[in-house]
C-alpha cells in the first residue's frame, strides 16, 4: 500500500527540492528551464526533482505550448506554508 505521507517527507527531505518548491511558491509557476537558471543545478537535475515533487502530490505540470509549467497543488502550498512557519520558528529560537 502506498504511503503518501512518506512520499511527501521523502520529497521534502532534500534541500534542493525544498528550494524548488519555495521558488515555485514565490513565482506562482515555473518551468524547469527557469528553475535551472536560478538554481545551481542543471535542467535535467531540476526535472528529476520536479518529478519527485509531482509524484508526492506537491506540484502539478501544465503543458503550455512547447513548455511545461509547474505550480503547487493545494497540498504543496500547505506544506510550503508549514515549512516557512517552521523556518521562522527555528530562526526565532536561535536568535
Language model: regions and residue ranges:
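Alpha-helical residues within the helix-turn-helix
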Residues: 37, 54-55
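Base-recognition residues in the alpha-helical recognition helix of bacterial helix-turn-helix
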Residues: 22, 47-51
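A conserved amphipathic terminal alpha-helix motif
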Residues: 79-95
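Generic cytosolic/nucleocytoplasmic N-terminal low-complexity/intrinsically disordered segments
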Residues: 45-47, 81
